[in-house]
């Protein structure tokens, strides 16, 4: 009996075994997941869907071609008479495959001819809102499909560039109404179109007025403050937020300046270099949309805008189901 007690005491007194951290056994190779992800992404390619909205003649097609350095978006034809302006807003899209350094991207540009071109532009945002929601619905139905595809084609609008005419005054009621409504369902990036028509002083004043209008009307454009993930994100995004709206100039014409090939526009005052940040803010817009935030734009579309639509639609379906059950129970009670 004493031996049993002694053995039990020894067992209790035995020190707990300490596991060595995995790092002590040498290299594991967890970081290799990054290379695996890179190879998979390069093999599959990815999609980016960008919508451009603004009245005719603001250089929407030219800016898109300049952003991606490709003849992607067809130049819209300037109507010569009132009859040639579409009676309703048309939604047109064109898809272009781009490859750079082994990375493949399927770019879809959605244009909205007819927006803001009429005397009465009341509710002209509705067809655009419907189109955006239709893409969410299409994606949702694919997700709910029992035999859904391994990779669902993504036609959701990731970003909407909204073109503001360079009036030098303030936002029009049309601008405010459109951005106020659409910013709830899509990432809005406002730009001042053809900013070279303004002096630097006029441009700065116009940007200040627009910023004040956005704030006064509760319009939350991309990158939204509430989606900053950490202090590093906040620091980077704050710099972009201070530039919004981007004052841009687009051009797909190349010129030689002091032995350098540049994209630019020639005026009677000289050549405007599109990618020169002292001339315009095109380079900052390109950085935001392509070089630093493209994946984040897609993530916000999926986790915020599409998720809000998905929850709304599923709640609607649940309510319809509940109402249907209640109706059947009421009918059965009446029959009794």
Task: Describe every region a protein language model picked out.
Residues 24, 115-121, 129-173, 189-190, ...:
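Conserved Switch II/interswitch segment of TRAFAC-class P-loop GTPases
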Residues 122, 127-136, 140, 214-227:
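Internal, charge-rich low-complexity segments
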Residues 51-58, 69, 101-103, 112-117, ...:
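Conserved beta-strand elements of beta-rich interaction domains across eukaryotes
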Residues 1-135, 276, 286-290, 332-335:
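Conserved G1/Walker A P-loop phosphate-binding module
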Residues 23-25, 41-48, 53, 58-59, ...:
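Eukaryote-biased feature marking scaffold/signaling PDZ-domain proteins and nuclear chromatin regulators
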Residues 3-15, 156, 173-174, 184-336:
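Conserved GTP-binding G-domain of TRAFAC-class P-loop NTPases and closely related GTPase folds
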Residues 37-39, 149, 234-235:
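Generic recognition of flexible, low-complexity loop/linker segments
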Residues 63-69, 75-80, 120-125, 143-144, ...:
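Short coil/turn segments at secondary-structure boundaries
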């Amino acid at each position: 009996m004493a031996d049993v007690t002694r053995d039990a005491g020894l067992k209790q007194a035995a020190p707990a075994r300490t596991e060595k951290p995995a790092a002590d056994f040498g290299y594991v190779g967890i970081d290799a997941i990054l290379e695996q992800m890179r190879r998979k992404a390069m093999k599959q390619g990815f999609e980016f869907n960008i919508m451009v909205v603004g009245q005719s003649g603001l250089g929407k097609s030219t800016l898109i071609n300049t952003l991606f350095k490709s003849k992607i978006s067809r130049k819209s034809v300037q109507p010569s008479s009132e009859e040639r302006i579409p009676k309703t807003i048309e939604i047109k899209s064109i898809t272009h495959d781009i490859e750079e350094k082994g990375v493949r991207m399927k770019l879809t540009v959605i244009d909205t001819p007819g927006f803001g071109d009429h005397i009465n532009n009341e509710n002209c945002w509705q067809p655009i809102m419907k189109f955006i929601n239709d893409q969410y619905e299409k994606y949702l139905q694919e997700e709910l499909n029992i035999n859904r595809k391994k990779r669902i084609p993504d036609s959701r609008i990731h970003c909407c560039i909204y073109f503001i005419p360079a009036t030098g005054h303030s936002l029009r009621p049309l601008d405010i109404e459109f951005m106020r409504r659409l910013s709830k369902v899509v990432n809005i990036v406002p730009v001042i179109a053809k900013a070279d028509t303004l002096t630097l002083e006029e441009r700065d004043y116009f940007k200040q007025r627009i910023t004040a209008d956005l704030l006064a009307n509760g319009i939350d454009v991309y990158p939204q403050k509430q989606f900053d993930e950490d202090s590093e994100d906040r620091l980077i995004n704050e710099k972009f937020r201070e530039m919004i709206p981007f004052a841009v100039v687009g051009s797909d014409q190349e010129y030689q300046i002091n032995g350098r090939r540049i994209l630019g526009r020639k005026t009677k005052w000289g050549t405007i270099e599109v990618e020169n940040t002292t001339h315009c803010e095109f380079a900052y817009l390109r950085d935001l949309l392509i070089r630093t935030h493209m994946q984040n734009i897609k993530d916000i579309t999926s986790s915020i805008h599409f998720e809000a639509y998905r929850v709304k639609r599923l709640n609607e379906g649940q309510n319809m189901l509940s109402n249907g059950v209640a109706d059947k129970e009421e009918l059965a009670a009446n029959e009794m």
